[in-house]
């Protein structure tokens, strides 16, 4: 499993914090950020790298998280969540099988962002009754 990271200029500093933290936690991290591009291009780069392998997960950081969320959810096979708390990060993996999350650097601080990222990457899909919802989401895009 690789954790694919991306950011625009507004999220790059927090993305660097997350990269160091996740590497320290022992995760394989790939940074696809092109700082000269906006959130749309960087979100697409993260989502495409996540979709390259079923076990990959993605985290995209910009100022508020909303823009990258909208971009990611337009892509076939991508279930993404905009997250600003630890519990939602963990639960979106467990119940929604989200493979990508977005967050805003102007919304969350560094310590909260680390906890959110850890909750997301350590969460596991529960399957079972949640699969109906995941199937419905996958039919939509």
From Swiss-Prot:
One GO molecular-function entry: ribose-5-phosphate isomerase activity
EC top class named in words: isomerase
Signal peptide: none
Pathway listed: Carbohydrate metabolism; D-galactose 6-phosphate degradation; D-tagatose 6-phosphate from D-galactose 6-phosphate: step 1/1
InterPro entries, A to Z: LacA, RpiB_LacA_LacB, RpiB_LacA_LacB_sf
The reaction(s) this protein catalyses: aldehydo-D-galactose 6-phosphate = keto-D-tagatose 6-phosphate
EC number in record: 5.3.1.26
Keywords from the UniProt entry: Isomerase, Lactose metabolism
GO biological process: D-allose catabolic process; galactose catabolic process; lactose catabolic process via tagatose-6-phosphate; pentose-phosphate shunt, non-oxidative branch
Similarity annotation: Belongs to the LacAB/RpiB family.
HAMAP family with a match to the protein in the record: LacA
Assembly mode: Heteromultimeric protein consisting of LacA and LacB.
Protein's name according to its UniProt entry: Galactose-6-phosphate isomerase subunit LacA
Record organism: Streptococcus equi subsp. zooepidemicus (strain H70)
